[in-house]
Structures are given as C-alpha cells and as structure tokens.
From Swiss-Prot:
Its EC number is 3.4.21.4. One of its GO terms (biological process) is proteolysis. CDD domains: Tryp_SPc. This is Trypsin.
Amino acid sequence: MKHFLRALKRCSVAVATVAIAVVGLQPVTASAAPNPVVGGTRAAQGEFPFMVRLSMGCGGALYAQDIVLTAAHCVSGSGNNTSITATGGVVDLQSSSAVKVRSTKVLQAPGYNGTGKDWALIKLAQPINQPTLKIATTTAYNQGTFTVAGWGANREGGSQQRYLLKANVPFVSDAACRSAYGNELVANEEICAGYPDTGGVDTCQGDSGGPMFRKDNADEWIQVGIVSWGYGCARPGYPGVYTEVSTFASAIASAARTL
C-alpha cells in the first residue's frame, strides 16, 4: 500500500499497497474521492515482465527470479512465511497464463518502525521465469522522469485493478517534497515524484511495494524507488513518496544472500 496517513501508506488491505491514479485535478476532501480515471494507460503484456502482484494487496518486483523486493509496510515481520502468493508473468491477473508461487520466507528491513527503511524481501518456493529488475546502487538515476506501474486503485478510494496500469511521474526535489510533508519526509531514505503543482497522476492504494523505475545509460530498466506513501492519491500539493533504493542497495543485497 501507499501510506495515506503516515500520510497514508498505500495499501489495499490491512498492510499497504498502491495503484496508479490518474484523476481529476480538483482538490479532494477527506470525505470525497476524486473523479474517476481520466488518463493513464494499460501496460502491454511483457512490457514490464519483472512486475509481481502479492496476495496481501501489494506490488513488488523480481529482485531475483525467486526473490521479490517490496515494501516493509506490506509484511508483518521477518521469518518463515508461506501465506503470501506472488503472481507474475501477466498483466491480466485473471489470465490462465499467470504464474502463482507461494512464499517461504520474509525479511523485513532491520529496524523498520513505520518511518523510513520501507523495504522487504520475499523468498519464493520456486522461481518465476521472468526477467528481473536491477536496482540502483548510486543516486545517479534519482532524477528525470520515472515509470510507475501497479494493479492498485485507479482513483482514491477505488477498487483494485485486474489489468496492470502504468504512468510516468517526474522527480520532485527534497525541498519541494518537504514543503508538502514537513518532518514526515525522511529525505536521506526517501525520494519523491509526481505533480505537486497540479496533482492528477500518482500511485494509490494497492500499489505499495511496487517499483518506480527508469532507463539507465545502457537503455535498461533500473529500479530507483519502492512505492511507500503519500497524502491521498494524486492530490495537488502532495507528490508520492518512495523508498530510495540506492540508499539501501547494499543492505538489500546482503539480505538477499541470506534467503
């Protein structure tokens, strides 16, 4: 989920997730959802083969074919865990071609307490035979325009989606993001993206844990963020907040070696 209130984590159920929201540009009150989707596009089959849907209502990406990188707020701790089902290989969650694999272990970021450090790894019982998504190890790619994708809600308060949706969101500076969230932003662990002036494009409930990514210098996808939280979905003045993957790249690699 994406946080709604940390400002909220972007979850679809008890733990968080986020979805692509492309909504009307008017302000939203706590009691009123924005207009239905007015933009955004459905991803093509095979366009983002590393995308994974998790049964608790979050997204994720294949760090390895048998390890999913997601958000810490999507899981309830570390240890053996066979309760999560990962679905991969499709954009249509109802497709007969969907690959469904159970989890065996979960590793939540050490020291996670609800603020910052919002990453986790899920070990799968068997590999999902799809390309993986490499992660950024430096801040060199923490700029420009990013892609986000997910099966989460397409409007604030909306339902989860059958088909994978995608959108582009531009980098938002720490200063601009801090003007929206103040001390809630952990600037050395988080990266912001979106349209703070107008709103209208964002991740939303059900996309939490999914990747924010862009092309690297070799024209290959590289993950720079993990969907974490934001105030509502696509509201003017409030960009999305993502775990800054490069900050935790070494810790993620070390943790993966233990699974």
